[in-house]
Amino acid sequence: MPQGGIDEGESPQQAALRELEEETGVTSARILKESAGWHDYELPKDLWGTALKGKFRGQTQRWFAMEFDGSEDEIDIGEKPTQKAEFDQWKWEVSDKLPGLIIPFKRKVYKAVIDEFSEFLV
């Protein structure tokens, strides 16, 4: 599930679509719903100073449910000339399995987002 920062002058919606394209190559998607609020997590203390470029102890995020209406050959998680790959694999998965696939300190956020967007998920 792509994530990233909001650039200056950019709306959260624009940032979500940009991050989706940067991290997966996907441009054939549309926003269905924006989360009602912001979701946050804190890094475990042993990651302070190293994760998130060493500058932050966690993140506050706005989430979006999107519909992908392209074909799978559009998905490209490989390294780009100006950007290192952020993922080494991808797969479609049913929503109730997603929290188990993510690092433990982000699971609470994933569960909340899945609950909030349940009307769109399988």
PLM regions with names:
Residues 95-122:
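Charged phosphate-binding loop/patch that engages nucleotide di/tri-phosphates or the phosphate backbone
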Residues 6-104:
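Unchanged
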Residues 1-2:
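A short gly/proline-enriched turn/hairpin at secondary-structure junctions
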